[in-house]
Amino acid sequence: MNTQQLAKLRSIVPEMRRVRHIHFVGIGGAGMGGIAEVLANEGYQISGSDLAPNPVTQQLMNLGVTIYFNHRPENVRDASVVVVSSAISADNPEIVAAHEARIPVIRRAEMLAELMRFRHGIAIAGTHGKTTTTAMVSSIYAEAGLDPTFVNGGLVKAAGVHARLGHGRYLIAEADESDASFLHLQPMVAIVTNIEADHMDTYQGDFENLKQTFINFLHNLPFYGRAVMCVDDPVIRELLPRVGRQTTTYGFSEDADVRVEDYQQIGPQGHFTLLRQDKEPIRVTLNAPGRHNALNAAAAVAVATEEGIDDEAILRALESFQGTGRRFDFLGEFPLAPVNGKSGTAMLVDDYGHHPTEVDATIKAARAGWPDKNLVMLFQPHRFTRTRDLYDDFANVLTQVDTLLMLEVYPAGEAPIPGADSRSLCRTIRGRGKIDPILVPDPAQVAEMLAPVLTGNDLILVQGAGNIGKIARSLAEIKLKPQTPEEEQHD
């Protein structure tokens, strides 16, 4: 980036010229790392801390960011401001040291809000589909030559990064409702994909509180802003009269302003028509499977159409869409002869979905695209509270696969809850009489326990939000083949 470009970018956020050094506590999180990446490319001195390296920290270190793999008071020395993720507790040594040194400590969303303040902000919120929709909007704007800045919660595969600094006036960002921090954002356009009960500890277990928080988020739009909302979602339909801003609705519903019609899935692609008010219909080929992704695309098209982006750019972007990391992510197709001696192959797909609605959408996409495949799921429940609160929903959804292997619950810092564990969930599913789940007590046993259930015409879904993504990549690296003791020792 040359000096003239950097000066232009720094002028976008004039008040932040007083800030020299920004330190991120929990920098390895996708949301934190994305903001750090944008700020590093804007020319700020960035440092951060986390407990272990990962692809996010490696990408940042490649940009010259200093990262400490520990949490120590001295890490915040000389910082102008400390940015903290919601996963970091108030007694973290770096947070304590920052307060003692009178260094401002702000949440991730507050920094994102500063980046958005002097740009045309487009924020994507909702219980499900945020990451993919953010990537779709970003892809369309990039294809149209608008060079947007984007900050996403997942890897945008076409760009190879979670975030990118553009030279245009647009900032496209995933908005996180999990800790209600999206209330800091003041975008020009907001998408709400759906609203379901999740992260209810943030909302005191009160769904009305969650709904009102989404309304408050939309009221951060200026009176001339626009809310783009999925009218198929019953909660959104209920809330529409309370939005108080210009709205565009989308969905399969007949009264949607942007309506999906004639949906058909062929393998990994969706084909459908979009009907828009006062515009010609367009026939879309979307390089992403599932009716849920058609809805995500409809949201992106609604925003792009409002901005005046031409249909050709929209259609090119959706047909060439490369997806996001861990969202129906194809990791390969592997011959089974070395795995269990059988002929044929098994496809391996990695997916982040960890709420029953998301898991259901992934299963439906797999069934629609590959109806003849033996559907095998390796599932890792995420959080004891979510497993408890959505226990019956999980039990119902998980019976839809042909074979289910289940890892222990990924705690995400939570204490175990009696009856909300994987063994109990397996027992409940088994009692329904449709499938016989297999509990995998040790992640090291996954390949060994997976091999015998593969038939030679399989689609393996590795599903969950904990550390199961690493397990998926490991399975791809070993091509599903269980390792002998000698091979493990060599590794």
From Swiss-Prot:
GO CC annotation: cytoplasm
Any one GO molecular function term: UDP-N-acetylmuramate-L-alanine ligase activity
Superkingdom of this protein's organism: Bacteria
Reactions accelerated catalytically: UDP-N-acetyl-alpha-D-muramate + L-alanine + ATP = UDP-N-acetyl-alpha-D-muramoyl-L-alanine + ADP + phosphate + H(+)
Residues involved in ATP binding: G126, T127, H128, G129, K130, T131, T132
UniProt keyword list: ATP-binding, Cell cycle, Cell division, Cell shape, Cell wall biogenesis/degradation, Cytoplasm, Ligase, Nucleotide-binding, Peptidoglycan synthesis
HAMAP family, per the entry: MurC
Protein name: UDP-N-acetylmuramate--L-alanine ligase
Organism: Shigella dysenteriae serotype 1 (strain Sd197)
